[in-house]
């Protein structure tokens, strides 16, 4: 094979694994992406089916806050593009309904009391 043939030879398409079932995705995503937070992760509370989670965070000043996240499963086109790369997860955690506003609490007990009053907590976590 001469130089130009090697230079312009197309890479063979990598095989794309099939999209896992929803149950498998939920299992795979358990405790994933907790390292993306700049604050310390103190506690993670999962919904009954583990597809949602409250992440309790503590900042450097000692204040607590939380974020509600849900699993976003990539659609077919996204998976065709992303799935060919090594070590790719079929989903990601994202803020639930895009809500990122947070309250700040001085103690974790105060936070947990407020968290349990959230309508999402009552619907998906109890």
What are these regions (language model features)?
Residues 2-52:
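Negatively charged, low-complexity tracts enriched in Asp/Glu with abundant Ser/Thr
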Residues 15-16, 72-73, 83-87:
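Intrinsically disordered, low-complexity regions enriched in Ser/Pro/Gly/Gln/His and often acidic
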């Amino acid at each position: 094979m001469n130089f130009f043939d090697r230079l312009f030879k197309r890479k063979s398409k990598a095989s794309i694994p099939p999209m896992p079932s929803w149950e498998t995705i939920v299992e795979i995503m358990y405790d994933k992406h907790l390292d993306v937070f700049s604050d310390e992760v103190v506690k993670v509370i999962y919904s009954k089916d583990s597809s949602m989670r409250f992440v309790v965070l503590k900042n450097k000043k000692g204040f607590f806050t939380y974020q509600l996240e849900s699993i976003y499963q990539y659609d077919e086109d996204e998976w065709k593009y992303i799935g060919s790369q090594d070590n790719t997860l079929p989903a990601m955690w994202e803020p639930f309904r895009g809500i990122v506003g947070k309250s700040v609490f001085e103690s974790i007990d105060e936070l947990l009391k407020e968290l349990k009053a959230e309508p999402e907590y009552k619907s998906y976590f109890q």
